[in-house]
UniProtKB/Swiss-Prot annotation:
HAMAP family: Ribosomal_uL10
GO cellular component, one term: large ribosomal subunit
UniProt xrefs under Gene3D superfamilies: 3.30.70.1730, 6.10.250.290
Protein name: Large ribosomal subunit protein uL10
Domain of life: Bacteria
Pfam families linked to this entry: Ribosomal_L10
GO biological process, one term: translation
The organism of origin for this protein: Thermomicrobium roseum (strain ATCC 27502 / DSM 5159 / P-2)
Subunit structure: Part of the ribosomal stalk of the 50S ribosomal subunit. The N-terminus interacts with L11 and the large rRNA to form the base of the stalk. The C-terminus forms an elongated spine to which L12 dimers bind in a sequential fashion forming a multimeric L10(L12)X complex.
Database matches in InterPro entries: Ribosomal_uL10, Ribosomal_uL10-like_sf, Ribosomal_uL10_bac, Ribosomal_uL10_bac_type, Ribosomal_uL10_CS_bac
Similarity field: Belongs to the universal ribosomal protein uL10 family.
PROSITE patterns: RIBOSOMAL_L10
Gene coding for it: rplJ
Role of this protein: Forms part of the ribosomal stalk, playing a central role in the interaction of the ribosome with GTP-bound translation factors.
Keywords of the record: Ribonucleoprotein, Ribosomal protein, RNA-binding, rRNA-binding
Length: 179
């Protein structure tokens, strides 16, 4: 039976695994407290956080939330980078920090209940931000509509030119400009 403190930690980790849009498991061995603090600050700007977790408690939390797929990643010192916002921004920031520090390493992650390898997390980080993807989708939807408007207005425009030419023939230039 876990102590009340461990039970609270299990519940907190369970909540993270249940609600986070992305959870990245990292090995933080050798990372200084100052570096961790700076990394946490940068993550908080992106609605993300960094938390050192115990593997046994995380394993229990994963079993309770149906995310047991992460248990193979729970070896050695583990810290969770989790995002409640844009998962791409959190992945980019984590990989950028890992490259800069040369100490933090990505073990893998969890996205929508699916296990991500370290390579998958890197691939996720190369995606454009959510807003840019949405803009591309909207642009893709608008382009056919503009084409349809062009096609439908073509015959009307042609009729207008024919009528203006006829008015010029019948009444002269002044009548055509007035029309």
């Amino acid at each position: 039976m876990p102590t009340p403190e461990k039970a609270r930690q299990i519940e907190e980790i369970s909540e993270i695994l249940r609600t986070a849009s992305l959870a990245i498991l990292t090995d933080y061995r050798g990372l200084s407290v100052a570096d961790m603090t700076a990394f946490r600050r940068r993550l908080q700007e992106q609605q993300a956080n960094f938390r050192v977790v115990k593997n046994t408690l995380t394993r229990i939390a994963a079993e309770r939330t149906g995310t047991e797929v992460i248990t193979p990643l729970l070896e050695g010192p583990t810290a969770l980078v989790y995002s409640m916002g844009d998962p791409v921004a959190a992945a980019k920031l984590t990989l950028e920090f890992a490259r800069q520090s040369r100490i933090l390493s990505v073990k893998g992650g969890l996205l929508a209940g699916r296990l991500l390898s370290a390579a998958d997390v890197e691939a996720l980080a190369t995606l454009p931000p959510r807003e840019e993807l949405l803009a591309k989708v909207v642009g893709g939807l608008q382009a056919p509509l503009y084409g349809l408007v062009s096609v439908l207005s073509g015959p009307i425009r042609g009729l207008l030119y024919v009528l203006q030419a006829r008015v010029r023939q019948l009444g002269g230039e002044e009548a055509a400009e007035a029309a």
